[in-house]
């Protein structure tokens, strides 16, 4: 009896109770809510990265998320935090691997060839999406300050076009039809090529303004206006093409791909001559459809000046957060010396100004 009593007392002191041996072990890894949340974040990030690696834009929501690929660092870091708090080792390894892949693809894409030869033309290009014409006044001020040689304007409806004509079409010369003349050195833009808006909002209206004489050239048929022209800049013929494909909305992905493919075909056909393609591409270097344009040999002006990741949209959060979907692309023979992103107000885009030099071998 004494032995049994001692054993019972010892058992009670240890806290043993009937059935204690059947208690479940402490939960670890993905059995914890934090680990499940980390796994969900990492799965989303990994799906986007897999499409980037596979060189495809896939289907919604991948194209929309690819536009913000650098910002996937934030959910990945959050996933790592939850994985660490949950002691989920696989999640930690997974998160670190995802960070490494994102860091790899943040690097600039595309060529940066430095052409030889002597400078034959200096060109300042400004491109701006004025959002249904709302930012026309801001654009006029920016043009007056920056004094670009060429201006590419997207979403320029009838009122926008009229204001631009009143502000910059001087000396009675209207170059709407691209007829000859001389370069305007006094701040005017007498030469223009336009696709007039036929919709109420005016998103399909586009205008190319030039100090230098323009000749009409075949544009690219698209939902929104994409006019073309040929400029005579100091005796050098330079092809101009305004870019404004449809945005990658879920209901318009097919059109977005088709119109970017048309820009790619244009680039491939004109890589051997001095050419500038500028505008709102509704795509970043992380979209396969845009990279195929760069693969023709065209170079991004912002890439040439080290500003690849500077956001141009949405203006409300840029430069702290956003994506660079506005571009100035150039063919062989061009160098870029400076890039600026300007706040216009009343538009969801920042204007882009790039200083270019055309060189030719002697």
Walk through the language-model features, giving the residues of each.
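Soluble catalytic domains of enzymes that build or remodel membrane lipids, polysaccharides, and related
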Residues: 125, 131-144, 153-172, 179-362
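N-terminal, active-site-proximal structural segment of metallo-dependent hydrolase catalytic domains
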Residues: 2-167, 173-183, 360
């Amino acid at each position: 009896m004494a032995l049994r009593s001692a054993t019972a007392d010892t058992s009670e002191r240890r806290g043993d109770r009937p059935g204690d041996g059947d208690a479940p072990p402490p939960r670890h890894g993905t059995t914890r809510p934090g680990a499940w949340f980390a796994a969900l974040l990492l799965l989303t990030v990994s799906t986007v990265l897999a499409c980037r690696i596979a060189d495809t834009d896939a289907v919604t929501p991948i194209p929309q998320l690819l536009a913000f690929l650098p910002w996937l660092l934030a959910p990945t870091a959050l996933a790592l935090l939850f994985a660490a708090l949950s002691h989920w080792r696989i999640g930690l390894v997974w998160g670190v691997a995802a960070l490494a892949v994102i860091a790899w693809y943040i690097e600039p894409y595309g060529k940066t060839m430095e052409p030889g030869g002597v400078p034959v033309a200096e060109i300042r290009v400004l491109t701006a999406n004025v959002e249904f014409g709302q930012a026309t006044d801001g654009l006029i001020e920016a043009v007056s300050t920056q004094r670009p040689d060429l201006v590419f304007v997207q979403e320029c409806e009838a009122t926008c076009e009229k204001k631009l004509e009143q502000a910059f079409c001087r000396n009675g010369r209207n170059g709407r039809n691209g007829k000859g003349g001389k370069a305007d050195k006094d701040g005017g833009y007498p030469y223009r090529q336009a696709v007039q808006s036929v919709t109420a909002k005016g998103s399909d209206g586009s205008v190319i303004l030039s100090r230098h004489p323009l000749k009409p050239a075949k544009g690219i048929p698209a939902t929104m206006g994409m006019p073309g022209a040929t400029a005579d800049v100091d005796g050098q013929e330079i092809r101009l093409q305004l870019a404004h494909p449809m945005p990658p909305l879920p209901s318009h992905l097919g059109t977005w791909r088709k119109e970017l493919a048309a820009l790619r075909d244009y680039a491939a056909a004109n890589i051997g001559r001095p050419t500038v393609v500028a505008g709102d591409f509704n795509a970043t270097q992380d979209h396969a459809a845009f990279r195929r344009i760069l693969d023709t040999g065209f170079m991004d002006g912002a890439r040439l000046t080290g500003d690849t990741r500077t956001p141009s949209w949405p203006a409300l959060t840029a430069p702290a957060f956003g994506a660079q979907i506005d571009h100035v692309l150039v063919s062989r023979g061009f160098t870029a010396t400076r890039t600026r992103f300007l706040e216009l107000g009343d538009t969801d885009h920042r204007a882009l100004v790039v200083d270019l030099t055309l060189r030719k071998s002697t």
